[in-house]
Amino acid sequence: MKKYIILHLSLILLVFIACTDDQKQDDKNITFQRSDFKVRKSLSGKTIEFDSLILRPSQIQLFDSFLVTCNQGAEKQFHIFNLNTAHKEGECTPVGQGPKEMMTPCFVNRNDSVVIFDMMTSTIFTYSSPEFTSGKEPEYASRISLDTKPLWSNIRSLGNGFLGVSYQETSPGFLFDQTGKKTMDFGTYPKTEQEYTPAELINAFRADLTTNRKEKVAITHYFTDLICIYNVNGTLEKQLRGPDHFASVFKEFRDGDIIGRKASPQTYRDAFYSPVYVGNSLFGLYNGKMVT
């Protein structure tokens, strides 16, 4: 197992800052091509060799000069490394459902504190950065439970509340207030010429989301190259379609008593992953290849 990590981002392919004049667009619908990205940037980084093993983290996050890796399934899931000294400060948060334990943790997009969402228990934990990166078992500053359980989604901060993907037919997202109460169904599913059952629709538009924490929300889709931009009230502002203009088609099937959904092999393609807002820019990983 390696002790080093390369701080190098080579897979960020798309940056959405503004729409160029040659893009086809109306008030809400914008199409773009690969050729619309006029500038190609090469990102470079350096290798930091730590004094302890780096496992195989499912997530990493920076808090000031500390790198925190999330290692789901490890005895203690968060490992804290000091970037300045290359020293491992410690580990924290055992697997479990106790007051200081988590089952399936995910980082929430905050930089003023450490906020972590446990999907399995639909619980949001907030810590001060110094407390969480001390190398000891941290004491949380707040712990709230969402009233929708379980919520198998990344959670993002939006205003004074939290937003997650719903995986329900009513809307693509759920908005929660700072107490964990669901306050609204957020957004609407895109219109499609394909006739879908509710379950097929949810699978066709499986999504991830990100926010700028204030007033903008971007919902990106795993199996269609479509990005939907909403305001804080859940009103659709723009749809960005491209660069390849495709949509994977899903169909229900029955196997005995089991009803499932699967994509048509002729249309099954990967689209967007891991969206992140940085200031007024939206970064996203894009694939575009057929799923085999």
Region annotations inferred by a language model:
Residues L83-T85, S129-F132, D177-K181, N231-T235:
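Short loop/turn segments that connect beta-strands within beta-propeller blades
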Residues N29-L55:
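A short helix->beta-strand "capping" segment at the edge of beta-propeller domains
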Residues H87-T121, S142-L146:
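Blade-loop segments of beta-propeller domains
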Residues V15-A18:
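C-terminal motif of bacterial Sec signal peptides marking the signal peptidase cleavage site
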Residues M120-S122, S128-G159:
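Asp-box/WD-like beta-propeller blade repeats and closely related beta-sheet repeat scaffolds
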Residues R56-Q61, P105-R110, W152-L158, E200-K214, ...:
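Structural signature of eukaryotic scaffold interfaces centered on beta-propeller domains
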Residues E237-P275:
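Flexible internal linker/loop segments at domain or repeat junctions
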Residues K46-Q77, Y273-S274, S281-M290:
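Beta-strand-rich domains and repeat architectures in extracellular enzymes and scaffolds
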